[in-house]
C-alpha cells in the first residue's frame, strides 16, 4: 500500500464535528489529500477533490487509486465548487491558506526561509509576486501589506520594496522586509511572516476566492449538508465567522455586518457556539496547528442567497493589483 499523505490539522475534530460522514463530499482544497482520505475512511461514498495546483494530483497518483471511483480529482478553484461538483453534495471541507507542501518547495516562492523565485502562485496562471511587486504603485503595496497582513510598518516596507526594484527572489524580499523591522525577540515570529502572507493573499486573490467559495458551498449543499472550514489567521476566520453568522441569522438583530441577511430565512444552522481549536495532543505533534480554527455550519432547506463581501469584513484594496 502506498504511503499515506500527512495528517492535516484538526482532522480528528473535523471528522467528529461532521459525523456521520456519508454521501458525496467536496474537499475544495485537496492538497496532500489528508482530509479526502479521512472522509473516505469515515464512510463518505464519494469525495470530489478540487485544487488549483496541478502538482498535487501528480503527487496523489501514488495512493489515489486505492479508492477507485470513490475519489474524483478536479483541477480548479473552490470558488467554482458548485459547478465542478456537478450536482448537490452532502458536505464541503475547506482548508484555507498555503499548504505545508507548497511551503516546503522553494521553487514555488512561498517561503521566506528558503530562497527561490518570487512566485507565490498556487496555480500556474496569473501574475507572479515579482511581477506585481515590480509594477504596483507604492501605495497599493502598502495597502496590501496593511490590509492583508496587518503589517504596521506597511508604508516603510512598501517604500523599501519600490526602492529596491526589480525583485526576483524570495530571499531578496525577506531581506528588505527584515531590514525595515526590529530584530525579533526569542519566541516571536520571523519578521517577514506578515508581509509574505499579505503578498501571497494578493497574488492568489485568496479573500475573494474565500467569499466566492463560501457562497458556492451554500449553493452546492443539500439540506442537512455540512460545511467545515479550517482557517489559520484572524482575517480568514473573521470572514468565515461573519459568513456563518449572517447566513444563520445568529449575528443578532441590527448587526452592521448582515443587515440584509437577517431578514432572510437562515441558510445554515450552527451546531457549535464557538470555533474549534487544536487540543494539547495535536499541538505537541503539530505546532502548525496552534493558530488553526474550525467552524461548521449545517445547511437548511432555505434557498441560497446573495453574499455581500463588504458585509463580511472583506479587506478591499482601493486599486486592484495596480
Swiss-Prot record:
Reaction(s) catalysed by this chain's protein: cytidine(1402) in 16S rRNA + S-adenosyl-L-methionine = N(4)-methylcytidine(1402) in 16S rRNA + S-adenosyl-L-homocysteine + H(+)
Keyword Methyltransferase among record annotations: yes
Keyword list, A-Z: Cytoplasm, Methyltransferase, rRNA processing, S-adenosyl-L-methionine, Transferase
Record-listed S-adenosyl-L-methionine binding positions: 33-35, 51, 78, 95, 102
EC code: 2.1.1.199
GO MF entries: rRNA (cytosine-N4-)-methyltransferase activity
Enzyme class: transferase
Keyword S-adenosyl-L-methionine applies: yes
Gene Ontology BP, a term: rRNA base methylation
Gene Ontology cellular component terms for the protein in this record: cytoplasm
Pfam families in the cross-refs: Methyltransf_5 (PF01795)
Subcellular locations according to the entry: Cytoplasm
Function, in words: Specifically methylates the N4 position of cytidine in position 1402 (C1402) of 16S rRNA.
NCBIfam families: 16S rRNA (cytosine(1402)-N(4))-methyltransferase RsmH (TIGR00006)
Family: Belongs to the methyltransferase superfamily. RsmH family.
Name of the molecule in the record: Ribosomal RNA small subunit methyltransferase H
